C-alpha cells in the first residue's frame, strides 16, 4: 500500500519517530487473538536470554506467530452489488450446495465459493457483503483436513447470515481444519458489518464457505488466489 504524501507545512518527524512511522507502514498490525501466541514465546525468550538456542527458538516462534496473526489493511471495491472474498487463500470449490441446516435457508442448493487457507495465509475473515447480521450459529464437529469435500458438513464450524440492504441473504461459514481447532467470531446478531469488515479468525489452517442467493453470478475460478476484502468473487442478482 502506497504511503500518503506529506502535506506542505507538516513538521518534520525526528529520526526515531520517522523510523517508527516507516515500521508501522510496512508491518501489518496484529489481530488481538494472536497476542497470547506472540507474548508467550517472547516471555520465554526473556527468561532464557542467557541460552542462545532458547532465545533464538523463542524469537523465531514469536515471529512466526506474528506473521500468522497479521491483520493487513484492505480496501474493498466501490462497486454496487458485488461480493468480495471473505478470506485470503485459494478457491477450492465453485459450485452449488445446500447451506448449513442451522441457518434455515432451505434445502435447495445455492451458489457457493469455498476458499482454503494454508498456514501461510492471512487468517482473519472479512464480511463478503455489507449487511445486518441476522444469525450466528456455532456447531461442534470433527477436525478433518479443511481441503476435503466432506469438511463443510462434518467439521466444526461457525455460520453467520448477513441480510443486505437490497434484501439478499449471504451466508459465511468458518470451518475448522486439521490444525485449526479454534474459531473466533466477533460478530453478533444485530451488528451491521460494512463490506470487507473483519469479523473473525480461524487459528492455523482452515476453510471459509460463502453461500449466495439464487441468481448470483459467481466470478471466482477454482485454483484462483484471493485477497480478503478486495477480490470480487460474485455479482449478486
From Swiss-Prot:
Which InterPro entries does this chain map to? PS_Dcarbxylase, PSD-A
Protein name, entry field: Phosphatidylserine decarboxylase proenzyme
Kindly give the HAMAP family that the UniProt entry links to this protein.
PS_decarb_PSD_A
Q: How does it assemble?
A: Heterodimer of a large membrane-associated beta subunit and a small pyruvoyl-containing alpha subunit.
Q: Tell me one GO molecular function of this protein.
A: phosphatidylserine decarboxylase activity
Return any one Pfam family short name: PS_Dcarbxylase
Residues modified as Pyruvic acid (Ser): 206
The EC number of this protein is: 4.1.1.65
UniProt KW keywords: Cell membrane, Decarboxylase, Lipid biosynthesis, Lipid metabolism, Lyase, Membrane, Phospholipid biosynthesis, Phospholipid metabolism, Pyruvate, Zymogen
- What is the scientific name of the source organism? Rhodococcus opacus (strain B4)
The catalytic activity, as recorded, is: a 1,2-diacyl-sn-glycero-3-phospho-L-serine + H(+) = a 1,2-diacyl-sn-glycero-3-phosphoethanolamine + CO2
Explain how, and how many, cofactor molecules are bound.
Binds 1 pyruvoyl group covalently per subunit.
Top-level taxon: Bacteria
Q: In which pathway does it act?
A: Phospholipid metabolism; phosphatidylethanolamine biosynthesis; phosphatidylethanolamine from CDP-diacylglycerol: step 2/2
Query: Family assignment?
Result: Belongs to the phosphatidylserine decarboxylase family. PSD-A subfamily.
Q: Name one GO cellular component term.
A: plasma membrane
Please state what class of enzyme this protein is: lyase
- Quote the gene name from the UniProt entry: psd
Q: Provide the record's note on post-translational modification.
A: Is synthesized initially as an inactive proenzyme. Formation of the active enzyme involves a self-maturation process in which the active site pyruvoyl group is generated from an internal serine residue via an autocatalytic post-translational modification. Two non-identical subunits are generated from the proenzyme in this reaction, and the pyruvate is formed at the N-terminus of the alpha chain, which is derived from the carboxyl end of the proenzyme.
Cofactor(s) the protein needs: pyruvate
Keyword Transmembrane attached: no
Q: How does it sit in the membrane?
A: Peripheral membrane protein
Principal location listed in the UniProt entry: membrane
The cellular location(s) given in this protein's UniProt record come to:
Cell membrane
The protein's job, in short, is:
Catalyzes the formation of phosphatidylethanolamine (PtdEtn) from phosphatidylserine (PtdSer).
> Which residues does the annotation list for site: Cleavage (non-hydrolytic)?
205-206
Amino acid at each position: 500500500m502506497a504511503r500518503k504524501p506529506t502535506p506542505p507545512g507538516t513538521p518534520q518527524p525526528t529520526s526515531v519517530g520517522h523510523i517508527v512511522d516507516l515500521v508501522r507502514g510496512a508491518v501489518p498490525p496484529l489481530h488481538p487473538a494472536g497476542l497470547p501466541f506472540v507474548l508467550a514465546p517472547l516471555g520465554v525468550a526473556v527468561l532464557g536470554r542467557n541460552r542462545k538456542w532458547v532465545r533464538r527458538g523463542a524469537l523465531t516462534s514469536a515471529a512466526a506467530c506474528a506473521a500468522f496473526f497479521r491483520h493487513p489493511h484492505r480496501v474493498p471495491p466501490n462497486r454496487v452489488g458485488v461480493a468480495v472474498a471473505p478470506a485470503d487463500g485459494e478457491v477450492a470449490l465453485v459450485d452449488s450446495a445446500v447451506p448449513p441446516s442451522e441457518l434455515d435457508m432451505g434445502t435447495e442448493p445455492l451458489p457457493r465459493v469455498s476458499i482454503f487457507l494454508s498456514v501461510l495465509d492471512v487468517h482473519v475473515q472479512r464480511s463478503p457483503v455489507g449487511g445486518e447480521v441476522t444469525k450466528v450459529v456455532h456447531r461442534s464437529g470433527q477436525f478433518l483436513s479443511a481441503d476435503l469435500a466432506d469438511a463443510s458438513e462434518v467439521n466444526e464450524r461457525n455460520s453467520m447470515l448477513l441480510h443486505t440492504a437490497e434484501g439478499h441473504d449471504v451466508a459465511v461459514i468458518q470451518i475448522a481444519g486439521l490444525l485449526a481447532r479454534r474459531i473466533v467470531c466477533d460478530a453478533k446478531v444485530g451488528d451491521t458489518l460494512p463490506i470487507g469488515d473483519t469479523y473473525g479468525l480461524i487459528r492455523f489452517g482452515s476453510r471459509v464457505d460463502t453461500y449466495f442467493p439464487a441468481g448470483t453470478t459467481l466470478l471466482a475460478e477454482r485454483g484462483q488466489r484471493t485477497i480478503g476484502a478486495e477480490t470480487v468473487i460474485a455479482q449478486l442478482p
